[in-house]
Amino acid sequence: MEKSLLKNIAINFAGLILPVFVSLATVPAYIHGMGIERYGVINLVWALIGYFSVLDLGISMATENHIAKARDANDGSIQRIFWSAFFLNLATGIAGAVMIWFGAYIYVVHIATIAPAFQREVLQSLPWIAVAVPIANVSWVFSGAIGGMEKFTLYNTNQTVGTFLFQLLPLAALYLISPSLAVVVPAAVIARFLAALLLGYGTFRALGITGIAKPEWPLIRELFNYGRWLLLFSGANMIATTLDRVVIGSMLGAKSVAYYATPQNLVTRLNLLPSAMLRTLFPRFSASGSEHAGALSHQALAFLNCAFTPCVVVALFGLAPFLNVWLGHEMAVQSAPVGRVLVIGVWLAGQSSIMSVLIQAKANPAQVARVGWIGLPVFALVLWLGIRWYGLLGAGVAVVAKTFFDYAAFLYFSKLKPQPIVRNMAGHLLFLIVATLCADYMDSLSSMAAIGVALVVGNLGWSYCESSELREVVARLRQRLLPSAG
């Protein structure tokens, strides 16, 4: 792949992984300072705000797509796109603020099981909770605009600073003023506002914006017509990603949900590299011609398999020992088998997502949305049958079956050459199947480590044989290293 793309992938990967470490460092301090119940309540508040992300209406990605396409035009279209998206999301954000004000009151008072003292604290925070919705809506437009310009260093710098503000400012308020939610929630919203200001300043610089422009209704309609399909696709994905836990809970009980959700939450952390690639590739696909975007897709899929598959092999062997140390022997025995199956699902979903963003950027986003909704009832049926016949393992197999369905559908609609893509995928998948079987039937850590290393080396060798680009990279490295060695 192009050096600029590899650089942007590395930047986006760093931008995704740094907030994880910040959260890991601050969560114990929050729990210690607020108490477990208050911390649980504030997480319910953020979850409630998160549901209102639907009010973005897919406009942030539509903005990214349209700005990427307009980058080379010097006709002022970028500013018109930005301001139309900005005012649209501001309006839906204000509407969301009104809805969450009343919705949060009903939820806290009549639905959620919250102690009366904490209820009062949340109700005192309601105006701040409402303000958080338009702040988030506008911030997504800023993110989409910067992404469309491929200014990823600027974006991730602002995001990292924003994450630090969001984690540390409420923490300071907690210890210096009061652990009350009436103090911590406003501090968090102020942090979000400051982060939005920084992101907005960066957006104005990246786009060269010098003044405010009126929104244009034709542009708003165009953005909405594009974004609505992304919204529908996101909705189908949101249902699919929670449906397995809901069905497991209704058929097998809450204990089985814990055995399933624990490895699921763990293995989804492997998504960082595919997510970094998607963030990088979407604007580039949008700005490129169809032929160039197709060539980039082939390169991206080969790169993802080469870089990601060895990591997945390590995860397959390391999952059970990690769960055993982290949560005990019973959790490892119950969760590791289904966790390994889910790892393969995450691996294949990363490839599917690259093809899906290609379709969204270059073809018709409606096709991706239709695949999501058509596959949903089929997935529900397969999930129910899998759990009924095979329990948790059946649920994991159903998830993997859905990723294969998505993979095949997106490959068809992307109009890429299927033979080299499927051959490359199947070769890497074979290594993962062998790793899964070995990890399932082996108890010796030393034996698992030896076979794991052998499979990683073998997989890298397969990538070397399959990828002419990788062979060129190795040749260049050899030319650099051998003279210095002499």
Write out the residue ranges for each language-model feature:
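Interhelical loop/hinge segments that connect adjacent transmembrane helices in multipass membrane
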Residues: M1-L5, L181-V185, L197-T241, T280, ...
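Membrane-interface junctions at transmembrane-helix termini in multi-pass inner-membrane proteins
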Residues: L6, V133-V161, A182, V343-I374, ...
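Hydrophobic alpha-helical transmembrane segments
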Residues: N156-R205, I374-F379, L392-F413, V453-V457
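Signature of the first transmembrane helix
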Residues: S4-A68, G93, A97-G103, A132, ...
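Membrane-proximal transmembrane or re-entrant/amphipathic helices at the cytosolic face
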Residues: A439-G486
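Interfacial segments at transmembrane-helix termini and the short loops linking adjacent helices
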Residues: Y107-W128, L316-S353
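Transmembrane helical elements of multi-pass membrane transporters/channels
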Residues: K7-S23, G162, A187-T203, W217-S286, ...
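Helix-loop junctions and terminal segments of transmembrane helices
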Residues: L57-A73, G148, G208, P263, ...
